[in-house]
């Protein structure tokens, strides 16, 4: 894929983007992680109670109007346009009422799809549906241990009132990310920084989408694009503009240089 490529992810998506940046080394030129679900074992999924919250969450209503009212109450802090999109795409009519103008509706994403983000569905392999030990997903903790292997500049964009990106969590992210200089080229710059959106929680991109977008655009435009255009992109263009003959000549000169150094 042609660079530059920017990775952007929120919550579990932030964890997945960060994981991809390590497992597919140097795929991103930079990444922006919004309140990512990344933390040490004491901050892992087993400690957050997300499974209990999911089981308590209502997923069905008698009418679409009831569902809309419930969602607007639960997500009252969200930007109105974002909330309208949530309501439009997150509920659907139950199969038996498709032909009716109104009737029972359900969430498009059911409890199972959400629960498997937090708890491993071990019954799929064992066939034993009940009685098994609960095993939480380890992705956020795994990624925490891999932060040192991140190979690109990283911006952490956090909600000022978020219970996930606490000052302690942000301190760990900033100190560990890209600390090992893994696969770093000579002269390559890797910035790691944070931005805080005041008066927002974990759902900051839904609560303040414009402010988040402005911060992301500023990071990409003023920082990362400048670095890319001045250094990495320029170097790549020099190589692409060479003929095959000149590329071979450069390779031979490089080999001779190595013989004098090794």
Curated annotation (Swiss-Prot):
Any single GO CC term annotated in Swiss-Prot or TrEMBL for this entry: peroxisome
Domain of life the protein comes from: Eukaryota
Enzyme class: hydrolase
Disulfide bonds: none
UniProt-listed Enzyme Commission number(s): 3.1.1.-
InterPro entries: AB_hydrolase_1, AB_hydrolase_fold
Assigned protein family: Belongs to the AB hydrolase superfamily. AKT2 hydrolase family.
Further comment: Gene clusters encoding host-selective toxins (HSTs) are localized on conditionally dispensable chromosomes (CDCs), also called supernumerary chromosomes, where they are present in multiple copies. The CDCs are not essential for saprophytic growth but controls host-selective pathogenicity. Although conventional disruption of ACTT2 could not be accomplished due to the high number of the copies identified in the genome, the high sequence identity among these copies of ACTT2 is likely an advantage for RNA silencing, because it allows knockdown of all copies of this gene simultaneously.
Function: Abhydrolase domain-containing protein; part of the gene clusters that mediate the biosynthesis of the host-selective toxins (HSTs) ACT-toxins responsible for brown spot of tangerine disease by the tangerine pathotype which affects tangerines and mandarins. ACT-toxins consist of three moieties, 9,10-epoxy-8-hydroxy-9-methyl-decatrienoic acid (EDA), valine and a polyketide. ACT-toxin I is toxic to both citrus and pear; toxin II the 5''-deoxy derivative of ACT-toxin I, is highly toxic to pear and slightly toxic to citrus.
Protein's UniProt name: Abhydrolase domain-containing protein ACTT2-1
């Amino acid at each position: 894929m042609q660079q530059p490529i920017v990775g952007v992810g929120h919550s579990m998506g932030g964890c997945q983007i960060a994981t991809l940046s390590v497992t597919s080394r140097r795929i991103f030129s930079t990444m922006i992680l919004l309140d990512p679900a990344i933390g040490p074992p004491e901050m892992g999924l087993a400690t957050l109670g997300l499974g209990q919250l999911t089981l308590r969450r209502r997923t069905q209503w008698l009418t679409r109007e009831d569902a809309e009212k419930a969602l607007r109450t639960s997500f009252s802090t969200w930007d109105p346009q974002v909330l309208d999109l949530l309501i439009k795409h997150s509920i659907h009519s139950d199969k038996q009422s498709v032909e009716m103008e109104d009737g029972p509706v359900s969430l498009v994403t059911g409890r199972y799809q959400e629960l498997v983000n937090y708890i491993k569905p071990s019954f799929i392999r064992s066939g034993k549906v009940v009685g098994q030990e609960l095993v939480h997903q380890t992705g956020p903790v795994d990624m925490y241990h891999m932060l040192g292997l991140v190979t690109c500049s990283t911006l952490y964009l956090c909600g000022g009132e978020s219970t996930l990106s606490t000052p302690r969590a942000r301190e760990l992210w900033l100190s560990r990310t890209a600390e090992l200089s893994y696969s770093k080229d000579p002269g390559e710059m890797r910035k790691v920084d944070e931005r805080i959106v005041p008066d927002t929680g974990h759902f900051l991109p839904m609560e303040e989408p414009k402010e988040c977008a402005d911060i992301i655009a500023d990071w990409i435009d003023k920082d990362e694009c400048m670095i890319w255009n001045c250094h990495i992109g320029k170097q790549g263009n020099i190589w692409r503009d060479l003929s095959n003959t000149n590329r071979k000549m450069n390779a031979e000169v490089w080999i001779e240089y190595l013989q004098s150094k090794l």
